[in-house]
């Protein structure tokens, strides 16, 4: 093994003889067969002597970390090899930037429908995932582990590749912190949802939309969204639902949320609807058995305990991650890979969003907010005279401008959402506007 790896890393931990001696001190004999020096950690492939149990080596992770003066050491078997991987942090870690990943040729491949810039592997190779094949994603990690940055990089990856006509987002952010910066971008199908009760209703609308899409695809004789879009000029957009803090929703409407998510995760893939859920509390009451069963693809950033690691991944190891974007990615094939997620600053995110807002206005689907508000108390309509005057004004406005949407009436007439939605419904009954089509738009008849 080349000693120049140790010189490059300026770290005796990359010296194979040094690590072999530490293991021998604990009664584990074997040889370091290969060293892979990555941007954040160095992978030592250790071949144990005959008769040495893997569990014995894995249990030495804390002792190896102490003897190498490292923050942590992660030990795991390497699939398809007779070696055990010992991952030790580098003295200085390289930054991984989003621009490096999206400029990679793999990102532009046509067969990747919804590309996600996952980051770099231990060896420094850019890794790109496809949300359509996942088809849903569960993310967990403590505060400061890089979870929120990961959500941002996923959103930006998709926005970078697909136009608002090709992909729409529904963003649910009970914390009112991370996703509010995307308010007003043209890719949004409705405003960012910050109320937990309203979020449950919005997920109910997504289930309804999924069923509507299935009926449409059955009528056309196609099996999925790609088959439908290949037949039509007006494409059916993908819908990506992003939930930033799952635990807040589970506290308010746990069973209802779980039922909706179960339906969507089992059936929504063919309809082009995908869910990305994140939580900083990966306990069994948040990540229930039902949710785990339907989210085979998961990402775990640094967690506080082995129990949390087992809850999200089914095995320990996430508690030994280094934070700041260091993660374990579990694919649907149950293979776990360590990846270093790319970083994107708040300033960059805001610049991108400002640019997107300058390009076009969001075209909200009125039915979503109507669906979300239907359980809430409506406005007082006791003053019939005012109601009639307002309705006549709205009809004149719609006929003059040729636009019919709830958000348009809200802006022009300066009225609340409930009233605007009811006026649109009345216009539909009176034959002034058409029913909403599959993308939520209405025509003035």
PLM region descriptions:
Residues 1-6, 39-50, 245-248, 376-381, ...:
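Short, hydrophobic beta-strand segments
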Residues 1-138, 150, 273, 282-285, ...:
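N-terminal "pre-motor" subdomain/linker immediately upstream of P-loop NTPase catalytic cores
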Residues 21-25, 62-70, 103, 156, ...:
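Short, intrinsically disordered, mixed-charge
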Residues 60, 154, 423:
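Residues within the DNA-recognition helix of helix-turn-helix
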Residues 78-87, 106-223, 231-303, 307-322, ...:
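P-loop NTPase catalytic phosphate-binding loop
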Residues 331-445:
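Conserved alpha/beta core segments of nucleic-acid transaction machinery
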């Amino acid at each position: 093994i080349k000693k120049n790896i140790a010189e490059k890393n300026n770290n005796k931990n990359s010296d194979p003889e040094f690590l072999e001696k530490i293991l021998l001190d604990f009664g584990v004999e074997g040889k370091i067969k290969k060293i892979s020096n990555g941007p954040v950690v160095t992978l030592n492939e250790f071949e144990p002597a005959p008769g040495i149990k893997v569990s014995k080596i894995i249990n030495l992770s804390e002792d190896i970390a102490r003897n190498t003066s490292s923050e942590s050491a992660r030990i795991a078997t390497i699939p398809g090899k007779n070696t055990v991987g010992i991952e030790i942090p580098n003295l200085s870690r390289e930054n991984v930037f989003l621009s490096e990943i999206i400029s990679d040729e793999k990102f532009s491949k046509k067969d990747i429908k919804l590309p996600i810039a996952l980051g770099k592997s231990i060896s420094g190779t850019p890794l790109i995932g496809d949300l359509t094949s996942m088809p849903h994603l569960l993310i967990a990690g403590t505060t400061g582990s890089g979870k929120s940055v990961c959500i941002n990089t996923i959103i930006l990856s998709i926005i970078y590749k697909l136009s608002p006509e090709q992909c729409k987002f529904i963003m649910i952010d009970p914390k009112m912190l991370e996703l509010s910066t995307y308010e007003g971008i043209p890719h949004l199908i409705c405003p960012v949802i910050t109320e937990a009760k309203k979020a449950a209703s919005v997920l109910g609308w997504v289930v309804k939309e999924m069923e509507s899409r299935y009926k449409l695809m059955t009528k056309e004789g196609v099996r999925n969204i790609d088959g439908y879009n290949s037949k039509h000029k007006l494409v059916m957009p993908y819908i990506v639902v992003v939930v930033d803090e799952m635990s807040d929703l589970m506290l308010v409407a746990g069973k209802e949320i779980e039922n909706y998510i179960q339906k969507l995760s089992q059936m929504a893939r063919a309809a082009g609807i995908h869910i990305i859920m994140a939580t900083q509390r990966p306990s069994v009451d948040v990540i229930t058995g039902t949710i785990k069963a339907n989210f085979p693809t998961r990402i775990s950033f640094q967690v506080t305990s082995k129990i949390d690691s087992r809850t999200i991944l089914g095995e320990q190891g996430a508690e030994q991650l280094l934070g700041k974007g260091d993660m374990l990615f579990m694919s649907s094939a149950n293979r776990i890979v360590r990846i270093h997620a790319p970083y994107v600053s708040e300033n960059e995110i805001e610049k991108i969003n400002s640019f997107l807002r300058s390009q076009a206005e969001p075209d909200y689907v009125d039915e979503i907010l109507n669906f979300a508000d239907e359980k809430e108390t409506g406005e007082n309509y006791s003053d019939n005279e005012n109601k009639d005057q307002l309705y006549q004004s709205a009809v004149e406005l719609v006929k003059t401008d040729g636009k019919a949407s709830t958000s348009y009436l809200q802006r022009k007439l300066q009225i609340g959402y409930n009233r605007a939605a009811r006026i649109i419904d009345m216009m539909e009954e009176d034959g002034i506007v058409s029913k909403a089509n599959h993308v939520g738009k209405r025509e003035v008849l």
